[in-house]
Amino acid sequence: MVATLLRDDPAADVLIVERGDDVGGTWRSNTYPGAACDVPSALYSFSFAPESGWKRAHGTQAEIYAYLRRVAREQGITQRTMFGCALRDAQWDGDRARWVVSTSRGDLTADVLIAATGALSTPTLPKVPGLEMFRGTMFHSAEWNHDHDLTGKRVAVIGTGASAIQFVPSIVDKVEHLTLFQRTASWVMPKRDHGIASSVRSLYRRFPLIQKVVRGAVYSQKEMYVVGMTKPFARKYALPLFEKRARSVLRKQVPDPELRDRLTPDFAITCKRILLSNDWFPAITRRNVDVVSSALTSATENGVVDAAGNEYPVDTIIFGTGFTPSEPPVAQHVRGEHGRSLAEVWNGSPSAHLGISVNGFPNLFLMYGPNTNLGHSSIVYMLESQAAYIADA
């Protein structure tokens, strides 16, 4: 998004502080098997940097990471970035009308501070008694241990969200047994993924306008979901059709009525994120999979325990327990004109004007700020809109 600022003023004194060793954010860090985007490739790219080479309708982690690295290089972003540099503290100095920023590589000041740490950057682990005693291997899906071979292992997967729904089908054939802890069932819809023919990619390269038209059509189709989510008449008539479709998928792919009942959400569709997958239900109905309808309550030296006290022997625990979008860690390190941190001001309920600026924090702008996430389309569109707003400011 810095590219938006630099296009208006190429000479702008812009410095990016990045704690990682490369650009890419979540697509650099999340390398678990099966990692891919649930937003169509046509939308999951910057308007100023169209990509004609997507090989699938939904980009894979490797494709998206390569795209982000290329755009950063071409837009001159990497030359303005201090990699391996973590933010320690940022304090507004009212006397000088500047931000005083402390990092792991020294201090600096800035007229404007932009917090673009993302909503899916810090993995969260549940506080489970006994984890410190577990003798096996455990890791979060966002910090996948590629050195640990899962072949023939007894694996416990904690969580059934957007990450688990991708990596579980990718590992289920390798493991001896998989125990899946599901605290809350999710609505699952088919993922309209398919390969993009080389002839189509060539057409996009030769005639960029065609790709723009396709992008516009996909965007318009996705925006129709908003009507179903927000308009009373549509909620009454359209959402039941969505739910009927999701129930149909569940009925066809899960023959066991008892398991099907446990996999059926007890809330209306769109109240939580709809998950997209073609192989989730077939994966978790395999003979070597047990679905436990409870949270993980404790761990032992050699296993995990459910809410009913049943223990399951496992060699490996994989946490698909998500991130901290409602409590971004950066909020603890940014202090405004009264010396209070963002976390203290928000007090567990983040809010910001347009999701971008917060009263009492002058010249601070948030990217992917509170309440700007989407349940139907591409966050990239939101980020570009925020970047344009910040550039204007």
Pin down the residues of each PLM region:
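Short beta-strand to alpha-helix junction loop
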Residues: 51-70, 82, 233-242, 267-279
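Short hydrophobic core segments
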Residues: 17, 87, 107-120, 155-158, ...
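Rossmann-like dinucleotide-binding core of oxidoreductases
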Residues: 1-22, 108, 115-255, 289-290, ...
